[in-house]
C-alpha cells in the first residue's frame, strides 16, 4: 500500500549572514513553502577588495552546509583577490526557498548556489510523482563542481540501540530528523526501514543539521540522520551515539568516552548484524552532499573563473584539511562530470522511492 505523503506547511525563514565584509540585506522572499521573513546578522570581516560573489546557502546557520560554504568562502578569498565571496543563508523548505529564489534571478547575476543532491531528489520526485510542489527547474542551475561529499550517519541516544530502533519502527514507527520528507536522509533511512517492514515519519521544520540534531537531543525524534561533523562533539561526550552508517564501507573516525569505534553499515562486509541478512540494502545508499552551481547561461568567462578558483580551493590545506577534520570526503568532479554524477544520483533516488510505495 502506498504510504501517504502528507502536505507540508513550512514557515520559511530567510536569515541573511554575510561572511566577508558585506552588510546584511533584508527583504521578503516568496517561495513554494510560503512567505519568508528576513533576519540579518553581519560578521566583522575584512573584504579582500574583489567583486562580490554571493554563495546562497538554503540551510540554517551552524549546519554542515553552512559551515562548509563559509570555509569555502574563507579559503577562496585568501587565494585570490578578483572576487570576494560572501555567504548568504536563505532558509525555508530545506533548500527549496533558496533554489526558487536563485532560479528566478537573471542568469548574469554573479551568485552561486549550494546545490545539494537531496534538493535534486525532491525536485525530481515532485516533478515525476507530484509528491510536493516544485516552483523551480533544476536545469536552471549549472554545477561548477562538487564541494561536499558526506556519509550519512544515523544517531540516537545512549539508551537506545539499532535493535531497539528497528523494533520500534516495526511496531508503530519511528520519528526522524534530517531534511524534509523525501530528502536524501529520508529516502535512505526510509527505504531501509520499509524493507525491514517498518515505518519512518520525518519531523520537518528544522533548518539545517544543528537544529535537526537538537530535535534528537530534546527528545522530539527517535533518530537524527546527519553528517559526521554534525554530532562529532556529542559522540565524544557520550550524549549521542552513532548506530549506523549509510554506506557499504565501515565508518571509522568517531571517538567515544570509551575510545574509538567502528560504525556498522547498511551493506558490504561491515553490514550491521541487526539488519535482515537476506535483504540487499545497497539501493538505500545514495550520493550525499552536493555542488556549487552558477546560473545556467552564465557568462562562460565567469564560469571558467569559478572553476579555476574551486580547483585552487580544493588544493589548499585550509579547505581539504578542514574536510578531513570533520570526516567528510575529498571527492572532486567538475562541470559536465559533476552534472552527470548528479543526474545518475537522481535516477538512484527514484528507485529508492519505489521502496516507500
Protein language model regions, located:
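N-terminal (or domain-start) structured segment
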Residues: 38-140, 181, 196-234, 317, ...
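A structural signal for short loop-to-beta-strand junctions that line the ligand-binding cleft
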Residues: 110-113, 133-153, 175-177, 241-243, ...
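C-terminal lobe and pocket-closing loops
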Residues: 235-314
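An extracytoplasmic/periplasmic, membrane-proximal ligand-sensing/linker region
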Residues: 50, 194, 236-237, 298-357
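Flexible hinge/capping segments at coil-to-helix
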Residues: 156-174
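Short coil/turn segments
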Residues: 60-62, 117-118, 152, 156-161, ...
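Short, low-complexity disordered leader/linker segments with a strong preference
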Residues: 1-54, 357
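Extracytoplasmic ligand-binding site segments that recognize negatively charged/polar headgroups
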Residues: 146-155, 175-195
Amino acid at each position: 500500500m502506498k504510504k501517504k505523503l502528507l502536505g507540508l506547511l513550512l514557515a520559511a525563514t530567510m536569515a541573511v549572514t554575510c561572511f566577508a565584509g558585506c552588510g546584511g540585506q533584508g527583504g521578503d522572499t516568496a517561495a513554494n513553502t510560503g512567505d519568508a521573513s528576513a533576519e540579518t546578522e553581519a560578521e566583522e570581516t575584512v573584504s579582500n577588495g574583489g567583486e562580490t560573489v554571493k554563495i546562497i546557502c538554503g540551510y540554517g546557520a551552524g549546519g554542515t552546509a553552512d559551515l562548509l560554504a563559509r570555509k569555502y568562502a574563507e579559503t577562496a578569498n585568501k587565494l585570490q583577490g578578483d572576487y570576494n565571496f560572501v555567504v548568504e543563508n536563505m532558509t525555508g523548505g530545506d533548500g527549496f526557498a533558496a533554489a526558487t529564489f536563485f532560479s528566478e534571478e537573471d542568469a548574469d547575476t554573479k551568485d552561486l548556489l549550494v546545490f545539494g543532491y537531496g534538493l535534486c531528489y525532491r525536485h525530481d520526485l515532485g516533478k515525476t510523482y507530484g509528491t510536493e510542489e516544485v516552483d523551480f527547474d533544476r536545469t536552471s542551475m549549472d554545477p561548477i563542481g562538487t564541494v561536499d561529499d558526506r556519509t550519512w550517519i544515523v544517531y540516537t541516544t545512549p539508551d537506545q540501540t539499532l535493535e531497539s530502533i528497528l523494533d520500534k519502527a516495526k511496531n508503530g514507527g519511528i520519528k526522524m530528523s534530517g531534511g524534509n520528507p523525501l530528502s536524501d536522509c529520508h529516502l535512505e533511512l526510509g527505504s531501509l526501514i520499509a524493507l525491514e517492514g517498518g515505518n519512518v515519519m520525518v519531523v520537518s521544520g528544522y533548518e539545517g543539521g544543528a537544529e535537526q540534531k537538537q530535535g534528537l537531543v530534546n527528545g522530539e525524534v527517535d533518530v537524527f540522520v546527519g553528517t559526521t561533523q554534525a554530532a562529532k562533539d556529542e559522540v565524544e561526550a557520550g550524549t549521542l551515539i552513532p548506530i549506523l552508517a549509510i554506506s557499504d564501507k565501515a565508518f571509522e573516525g568517531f571517538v567515544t568516552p570509551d575510545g574509538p569505534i567502528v560504525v556498522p553499515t547498511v551493506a558490504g562486509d561491515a553490514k550491521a548484524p541487526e539488519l535482515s541478512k537476506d535483504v540487499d540494502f545497497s539501493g538505500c545508499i545514495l550520493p550525499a552532499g552536493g555542488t556549487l552551481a552558477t546560473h545556467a547561461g552564465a557568462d562562460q568567462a565567469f564560469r571558467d573563473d569559478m572553476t579555476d578558483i574551486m580547483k585552487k580551493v580544493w588544493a589548499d590545506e585550509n579547505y581539504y584539511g578542514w574536510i578531513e577534520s570533520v570526516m567528510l570526503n575529498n571527492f572532486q568532479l567538475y562541470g559536465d562530470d559533476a552534472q552527470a554524477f548528479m543526474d545518475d544520483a537522481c535516477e538512484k533516488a527514484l528507485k529508492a522511492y519505489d521502496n516507500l510505495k
